[in-house]
């Protein structure tokens, strides 16, 4: 059976026009107004105006008129595109966080034969990462080929210098500026502004300007999706339907406990065998004073939706589903109604945890529905719909694996691992579909499971880790999860083997396709956290208010009139500079330079008295770390931690604790936010890479060079010396 995207490579010259027509058809086919809600943690805004359907029809009609001319131009350009190429196809498979030492260990033990063969076929090298080695920073340097001073991403969060509050670093949202009010309803007349804060041009856009087609699947920091000659499915920082980076829901008959990080507990009542509650959706910006939209559901204990026995029946909307203890439902589509015919869809999965003695139900964060996305999550917009139609619903949330539900002990290791494997399986379908439709050009896909599973299961690798179960539970018995990370690497090796057979053949390939397997950084234990703000207090650089509350977040307990420096987020410290921060006291210039030098001298080499280990290897001035027009937005000081250490959980959200050092006993027990020299990634290649010390930011320029495209002057990366014959 044919489908609209089956021959992407063959019809590359006409693809943009076809996509406009397809998109118009999809919008007209959806029997609901084309409004939606968006917002990465900053509220929601109606995402399209009342004129969107008319405008889309006009664009589709225009595309049809221009189709013959565009086809002729692109077909001529397409024939020239590969005239200087050294390869016909480049495939880059990203395994986020693959650790070189573990890969080398498992290869030596014969457990990863495919990566072993790939390395021997071409090469294996460690891959230099960036400062700091955080995924949004690293992947931004990968896709732009520049240092953070030019792409403007330094952390997951930025500090708002006016309020000292954290903002999402990659995206800003501004609501529609024009609305019309009809009775109790308010409708937008223009679109909200969803602005990508990452600067720099993705290298695949440069390829597209030279006629090279690209498929980009779930590469971080590609939301909102940018136009390109090809297809893009966005990843990290795509919000959930409530505008957060992932908010789970936990329904229980138990009294509400302490505040949950990463989600919320909803207390429910059981009436006989029936529990009624509701899913909380986005804020209703259409109906005045309506609050959040809700989707009611009912759970009937002891009932089944079908003939197969179940523990309970879930009814939501017009559909019923079986619930079994410890098992996830499939993705369930949930409709939220704002009124006046405005609706928005999301998808989520339910898992029944317990029915006796207490009722407990876990719901994953409500993802944007890829079939009817409430905002664009792909380019073209129809691409996410195509994937959903072809393979079924799939996770769209940027950080899709619910690490906080495991951290908060609402789900167990098995339930979290099942999430990760399921999402990886979805990604594999998307990746192989892209490979089938990218016979010439570039195909890039990133798998996140390697990162998420190592974050949450590293504790099983080290018996002396504070979070190892035997150190928390005196009755602990050895668990299968002591091999979870090994099993992960073996599973990723199988993915590599399947990819090699698909693109290189059973032998060494014909040289026309080059395969790279890469990671953006390695991995390290996270045993001890450091409260940077407590260190600043103890060293006289920060003062607290006299009435400071011990559990205050977001630095609200700080006396800014007596504070010279502060920490927020994962990357480093900020100086409370006069004229930049709203309550700054440090004069720019000489006073600023002296203060930074003083803190660098005191904190570099900081030792942990409990372990005797060096916790901080070095502290760097941003003037040394970064070069470029956006350096001013970076943290003033970047902290390089030793293996085993990281910024404390509370420091990241501006909460100040009594001690500088503390044990990390959370399931999130591995990390990579340390000195970048200590945590390189991996580079496996089907072709020999002769360059010494390759870096992540060199891969974009290398791709351009392989396709015979000149490297832009602003790129900091350089093409690697790849041994390859003419394609």
Question: Over which residues does each language-model region extend?
Answer:
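N-terminal signal-anchor transmembrane helix
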Residues: 72-88
């Amino acid at each position: 059976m044919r489908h609209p995207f089956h021959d992407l490579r063959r019809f590359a010259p006409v693809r943009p026009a076809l996509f406009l027509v397809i998109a118009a058809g999809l919008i007209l086919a959806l029997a609901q107004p084309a409004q939606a809600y968006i917002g990465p943690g900053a509220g929601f805004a109606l995402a399209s105006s009342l004129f969107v359907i008319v405008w889309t029809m006009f664009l589709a009609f225009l595309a049809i008129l221009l189709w013959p001319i565009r086809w002729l131009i692109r077909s001529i350009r397409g024939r020239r595109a590969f005239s200087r190429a050294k390869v016909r196809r480049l495939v880059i498979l990203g395994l986020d966080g693959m650790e070189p030492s573990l890969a080398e260990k498992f290869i030596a033990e014969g457990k990863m034969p495919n990566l072993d063969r790939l390395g021997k076929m071409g090469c294996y090298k460690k891959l230099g990462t960036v400062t700091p080695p955080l995924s949004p920073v690293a992947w931004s340097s990968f896709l732009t080929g520049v240092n953070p001073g030019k792409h403007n991403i330094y952390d997951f969060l930025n500090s708002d210098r006016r309020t000292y509050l954290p903002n999402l670093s990659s995206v800003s949202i501004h609501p529609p500026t024009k609305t019309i009010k009809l009775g109790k309803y308010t409708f937008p007349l223009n679109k909200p502004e969803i602005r990508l804060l990452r600067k720099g041009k993705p290298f695949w856009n440069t390829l597209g300007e030279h006629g090279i087609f690209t498929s980009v699947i779930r590469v971080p920091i590609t939301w909102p999706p940018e136009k390109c000659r090809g297809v893009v499915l966005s990843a990290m920082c795509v919000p959930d339907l409530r505008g957060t980076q992932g908010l789970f829901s936990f329904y229980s008959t138990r009294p509400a406990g302490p505040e949950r990080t990463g989600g919320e507990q909803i207390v429910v009542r059981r009436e006989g065998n029936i529990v009624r509650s509701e899913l909380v959706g986005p804020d209703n910006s259409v109906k005045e004073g309506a609050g959040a939209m809700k989707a009611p559901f009912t759970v009937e204990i002891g009932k089944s939706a079908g003939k197969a026995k179940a523990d309970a029946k879930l009814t939501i909307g017009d559909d019923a589903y079986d619930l079994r203890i410890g098992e996830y439902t499939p993705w369930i589509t949930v409709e939220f109604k704002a009124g006046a015919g405005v609706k928005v869809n999301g998808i989520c999965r339910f898992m029944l945890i317990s029915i006796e003695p207490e009722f407990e139900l876990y719901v994953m964060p409500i993802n944007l529905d890829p079939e009817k996305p409430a905002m664009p999550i792909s380019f073209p917009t129809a691409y996410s719909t195509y994937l959903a139609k072809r393979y079924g619903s799939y996770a769209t949330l940027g950080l899709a694996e619910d690490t906080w539900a495991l951290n908060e002990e609402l789900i167990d290791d098995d339930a979290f691992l099942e999430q990760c494997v399921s999402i990886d399986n979805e990604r594999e379908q998307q990746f192989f579909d892209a490979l089938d439709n990218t016979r010439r050009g570039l195909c890039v896909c990133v798998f996140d499971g390697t990162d998420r599973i190592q974050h949450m299961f590293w504790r099983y690798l080290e018996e002396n880790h504070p979070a190892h179960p035997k150190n928390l539970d005196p009755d602990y018995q050895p668990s299968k999860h002591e091999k979870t990370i090994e099993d992960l690497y073996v599973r990723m090796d199988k993915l590599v083997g399947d990819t090699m057979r698909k693109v290189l053949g059973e032998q060494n390939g014909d040289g026309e396709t080059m395969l790279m397997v890469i990671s953006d950084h390695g991995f390290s234990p996270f045993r001890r956290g450091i409260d940077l703000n407590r260190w600043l207090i103890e060293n006289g650089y920060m003062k607290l208010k006299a009435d400071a509350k011990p559990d205050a977040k977001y630095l609200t307990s700080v006396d800014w009139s007596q504070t010279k420096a502060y920490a927020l987020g994962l990357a480093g410290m900020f100086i409370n500079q006069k004229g930049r921060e709203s309550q700054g006291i440090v004069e720019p210039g000489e006073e600023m330079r002296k203060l930074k030098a003083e803190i660098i001298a005191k904190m570099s080499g900081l030792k942990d008295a409990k372990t005797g280990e060096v916790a901080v290897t070095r502290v760097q001035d941003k003037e040394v770390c970064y070069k470029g027009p956006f350096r001013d937005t970076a943290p003033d000081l970047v902290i390089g931690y030793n293996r085993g250490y990281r910024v404390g959980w509370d420091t990241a959200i501006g909460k100040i604790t009594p001690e500088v050092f503390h044990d990390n006993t959370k399931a999130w027990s591995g990390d990579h936010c340390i000195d970048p020299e200590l945590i390189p990634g991996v580079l496996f290649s089907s072709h020999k890479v002769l360059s010494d010390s390759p870096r992540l930011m060199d891969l974009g320029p290398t791709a351009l060079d392989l396709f015979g495209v000149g490297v832009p002057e602003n790129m900091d990366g350089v093409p690697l010396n790849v041994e390859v014959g003419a394609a």
